[in-house]
Swiss-Prot record:
Lineage of origin: Archaea, Methanobacteriati, Methanobacteriota, Methanomada group, Methanococci
Gene3D superfamilies in the cross-refs: N2,N2-dimethylguanosine tRNA methyltransferase, C-terminal domain (3.30.56.70), Vaccinia Virus protein VP39 (3.40.50.150)
Function: Dimethylates a single guanine residue at position 26 of a number of tRNAs using S-adenosyl-L-methionine as donor of the methyl groups.
GO molecular function term, any single one: tRNA (guanine(26)-N2)-dimethyltransferase activity
EC class: transferase
Catalytic activities: guanosine(26) in tRNA + 2 S-adenosyl-L-methionine = N(2)-dimethylguanosine(26) in tRNA + 2 S-adenosyl-L-homocysteine + 2 H(+)
Entry EC no(s): 2.1.1.216
Protein name in the entry: tRNA (guanine(26)-N(2))-dimethyltransferase
Pfam family of the protein (one): TRM
């Protein structure tokens, strides 16, 4: 074992990890960025929380890194309590050692299956964070029911992004009851949100995303639970289908239904709230969290200003129109000069989010080549 630091927290973790299910206790150092962002986003949510008690649950605790960082680093004037669970007795032992290391008394540890722990706590938690190895689907129903407090927060990670991005089409249809679409990683998190919205609606619960990102091997989202059939109906109205021809996306609403050539359903509404993102960014900067976490938050802050589903991949677009790829910064400058909003996206170095149409981009790239060459 070794002791490392993440944020303001000390953690005892395995000396070596294969980052697979073979590990006795799972700890992934690559996910420090994920945890930095998670603490920042939940802190932003917590800043507007009006009750005296704030109850959180990390039912898939592993080494306890996520839940313990929440317990140690979240600032709250009231009573903040965290429940951490794991089915693995070795993990439970390590979580308890990490609690001693950080001198925390506001955490309760459970040696229990995640679904059992969540089911025993129906409508109890203000925040449930599902961070599994693979898909969150097996835990989603229990997670929704455990976070049905008024204005609760459901956070979830999916590491099966190859499935969500369309590499395993049949698996996606089977697991997420949706047809995936290849090419744009943002659609992975939108598909995951869409599935969660459908699951929650049967309980007359609407889910409203306040922060989402796709980084490395995972997709992650944070969704506020809003009670009432009307809220569930409003959330469903944000679902729809997408057809992509070359770089052009076409959309159909959920009620219109899908037809041949369309994928989905995807969540087509806003997936990140501007104020939440900005407050999370301020938190990450103030606490000197990892530079990478700050960079991702900065990029998503700019993305949240532009209402576009996905992005335009400049390399793919230029390949389609048979043009050499101009410098991305030059394309951005030309778009701005023509009155369009534009920003790079956090998940694709060649991706641009803009309010320009595909035809506008084609014209600008063609004009760039005619002037340059």
């Amino acid at each position: 074992m070794k002791i490392i630091s993440e944020g303001e927290t000390k953690l005892m973790v395995p000396e070596e990890s294969t980052l697979s299910k073979k590990d006795t206790v799972f700890y992934n150092p690559v996910m420090e960025t994920n945890r930095d962002i998670s603490v920042s986003v939940v802190q932003s949510f917590l800043d507007d929380f009006k009750r005296d008690e704030f109850l959180m649950c990390d039912p898939l605790g592993g080494s306890g890194a996520r839940g313990i960082r929440y317990a140690k680093e979240l600032k709250f004037n009231g009573d903040l309590k965290v429940s951490i669970g794991d089915i693995n007795p070795s993990a439970v032992k390590m979580i308890k050692e990490n609690l001693k290391l950080n001198e925390l008394e506001n955490v309760e540890v459970f040696h229990e299956d995640a679904n059992v722990l969540l089911s025993k706590n129906f409508k109890v938690f203000n925040v449930v964070d599902l961070d599994p190895f693979g898909s969150p689907v097996p835990y989603l129903d229990s997670g929704i029911r455990a976070s049905l407090t008024k204005g609760g927060l459901l956070c979830m990670t999916a590491t099966d992004t190859a499935v969500l991005c369309g590499a395993y089409r049949k698996t996606c249809i089977r697991k997420y009851n949706a047809v995936p679409l290849k090419g744009d990683k943002e659609l992975a998190v939108r598909l995951m949100i869409g599935y969660a919205v459908k699951m929650a609606s049967k309980y007359d619960i609407g889910l409203k995303p306040i922060f989402s990102h796709v980084t490395d091997h995972y997709a992650r989202t944070f969704m506020v639970t809003e009670r009432g059939a009307g809220k569930a109906d409003s959330a469903i109205e944000n679902l729809g289908y997408i057809r992509q021809d070359s770089e052009q996306k076409s959309f159909k609403t959920f009620e219109e239904g899908s037809e041949k050539g369309y994928a989905g359903p995807f969540y087509l509404g806003e997936i990140s709230d501007k104020n939440i993102v900005q407050n999370a960014l301020n938190t990450a900067k103030t606490r000197n969290y990892s530079k990478r976490a700050v960079n991702i938050l900065e990029m998503i802050s700019r993305e949240s200003e532009i209402n576009q589903v996905g992005c335009f991949d400049i390399h793919e677009l230029c390949s389609f129109i048979k043009k050499l790829v101009p410098p991305v910064n030059d394309i951005m400058e030309n778009l701005k000069e023509n009155g369009f909003k534009v920003t790079r996206v956090h998940y694709n170095p060649y991706g641009l989010k803009t309010d320009a149409e595909l035809s506008d981009l084609v014209v600008l790239i063609s004009e760039y080549h005619s002037k340059k060459y």
